[in-house]
Amino acid sequence: MSLEKSLDEIINERTNGFDHKHSRRRGSQNRISKKSRLTYKFKRASKEHNSSPDDGPWQHDLDQEQDAHPRTTHLQKRQHSENRFGVRVENLHYQVLEKDVLSLFENFHPIRVIMNYDRAGRSEGSCDVYFETSQDAEDAQKTLQSTNLKGSEIQISKKSPPSLFDRISDMPHSARKPSRSSRSNRGFNRSSKKDDRSFRSSSKKSSNNSISHEDLDKELDEYAMSFHAASTVSSHSSQDFTPSIANAHEKNEPVAPSKDSNLTEEMDLQMEAV
């Protein structure tokens, strides 16, 4: 440091150096803070994307399809089998509930009771009771016929098994309706069979219409032979006709008119008549 510098110059140099270092530090800090903010935004966006409840559109569609066409559960299959052996109970008091009917038939192993109500929710005075076997249903009918239940004598009749239409209507929608894959496979099989049939028919037609080289050579030879025979016949006829004309001229005899000349004369006469 020079001794000739004044105190003010020394202070200004130190101040400028401090400001320069401080500005560089602040610039690097700003760059670091910008980078950290970008990194934080990227991590946050990726986290929100990965933690979204819907991983893809197919998952949502699959849930909707399952809701629209529920699978046949074990309970539903059991219920369909349970509807085979049942009795109809009529003349029930309007206060009779499902638990009352179950307690009445408990000795005959009932597995299901269906109370019949109208649209207003009022009892129709009847219910259907289903059993494990047909023997249990018959025993319950014989034993509990005309039993008094809450002041009313019940009437029990054997319930006929459901018809085919009822079984199909009670069947879940997913069991009745074929899946998309099966329909698409059937459509693919039909189209492939049609294509196969069309290909085979076209191949048969092409095989029937195809002509080999030997057949072509044979046809050409036949045509050449027929043409040669025709030319030979015409040459012989002209040779036979020429000497006869020459002999007639030598003998000063009239030449017999040919068929062509006669035909020409007839045509001329017809034209003159017209």
UniProtKB/Swiss-Prot annotation:
GO terms under biological process: poly(A)+ mRNA export from nucleus
Positions of the UniProt region annotated as Disordered: 1-63, 148-217, 230-274
InterPro entries recorded: ALYREF_mRNA_export, FoP_C, Nucleotide-bd_a/b_plait_sf, RBD_domain_sf, RRM_dom
Ranges of biased composition (kind: Acidic residues): 263-274
Keywords: RNA-binding
Protein name as annotated: Uncharacterized RNA-binding protein C106.12c
Lineage: Eukaryota, Fungi, Dikarya, Ascomycota, Taphrinomycotina
Bias (Basic and acidic residues) ranges: 1-20, 45-63
Disulfide bonds: none
